């Protein structure tokens, strides 16, 4: 009987997954948009239903109004944000990361960060059928999903709208030539997908306690369900949701509730690796969405090439030509390091110096992410977990064996590099969107290990140690100035190391892989080996940053290195500029000092960060430094390009606002 009860519980979990997965499948199948904010959109339905219940509205109206409100919000996000990124999937994905932060923090501001439960006579009613308990909300959710699946099946299989949507999913260009109104169909899919999430969220609020951060734990599995079931296949989504929910529910009952999420993640990982096209119908290209560095740099790189040609052809003297060829960016790097070196002198207060230290530590992690993305085109979302590996290695060696800091540092780098190597071997052979999903899943598995291996990590309580890094000869790092300079020296060493990698033959091979993988492979480049190698280097650098973060905070917990830290690292690099050397440092400076300068609370600061990330992707995808670099190139043409024909080819300053000419987005708007 207990087994039957667990299967019933699995049914409720599968229904929750299905409400997210159906929306993902419909939207992703048509737009190739990796929308990781779908879990937060479901939570909006939960919060709105909770508010309507508190306002005293009938329960049916609470569910209906929450569904309609979320559908409208989803369509607004489509028109204002996602519609601008149809030809650049990576930018759409990054926008969804920003929306995760925005919706989470806005929910905290509006509803608070406590766990919320909706209690009504309906929610507490339970049916007992031969010893098996069925709650009234569970029955409502199951019946609703059966009706919803019937409607969706009829809509997509038997109507003109459904056939048009499937045609667009298979080949958008051909569908456009046939006269199918792409914009209307995309609006339709966003409305339907968001409404399903809102409906599921409203009923979810009647079944489970939730808070502002509950969405992330469901969206990974739901995205895997959409892919496993086959994009666009309603039947596949149903089967895949059961396939993942049942092992998780049984593991929770018979093995360990704390390890239960790991089973769902492992099953999803294995199926994505060995059955990437789905169990049933698949769009066939769902995992082949091309995440390209060019989404953030195309026109900027083209303008740099024109600038180099103009300098070579210009009539300026040889000394001045060499200075111009040296470039603004390298001057900027030297100036940045001089300013960072003088920070303890410039920043007189201890609080400002502490912020500067935090900035430098984040910049170290940002440089590692920058290396993989800028050099190899590998968009990694594992920064937080790999920093955690380094931080826990240092904390464990210090706590149990009192190992010297200068031995902890290489051990942590090696451990994080080894974990990154394993992740790379597992995930990097997959295509872009699958790689993002797999790395997030494997990162969550690492965080679960941190939480559950209490004998090593002390679980969610974590490890605390106030000891400073070990002295180096006469230098003691107990003071704020000395610790800052330690972090600064590690940033300088990391930057020099990355510069050497970029200038090496290995770095040039990575560029060839980034620009054209198939061509690089045809020229004899071992693409898989080189990508795994650069991912391993990224892990080692992240491990070093994790050690420094542990010594900066003087404690370590699994929550310290969870998904929000990864999103912060992505924000730092993209905010500063993903294709310029100064990008990680400038992005880290803005990220660290902005709350202090504007006197923002932590919640408001995170909300501002999310808005900044979305605004940067929409308004200036090359980042702050990339924007100024573009303006510098344009100004150079106007002031110095005197050779005939050079001025005529000068780039328009306004072109740097958006390096991607999103023609497809314009067609469907």
Predicted regions: what they are:
Residues 2-5, 25-34, 50-62, 83, ...:
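Short, hydrophobic transmembrane alpha-helix segments
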Residues 2-6, 48, 205, 225-227, ...:
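Interhelical loop and adjacent transmembrane-helix boundary motif
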Residues 14-23, 176, 180-204, 216, ...:
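Transmembrane alpha-helices
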Residues 15, 24-46, 87-92, 161-164, ...:
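Short, non-helical or kinked segments that cap or interrupt transmembrane helices
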Residues 16, 90-94, 98-114, 130, ...:
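Transmembrane alpha-helices and adjacent helix-loop boundaries
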Residues 16-26, 34-54, 73, 77, ...:
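Hydrophobic alpha-helical segments within and immediately flanking transmembrane helices
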Residues 71-72, 76, 96-114, 134, ...:
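Mid-bilayer segments of alpha-helical transmembrane spans in multi-pass integral membrane proteins
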Residues 151-190, 207, 215, 496-534, ...:
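Membrane-helix/interface signature in polytopic inner-membrane proteins
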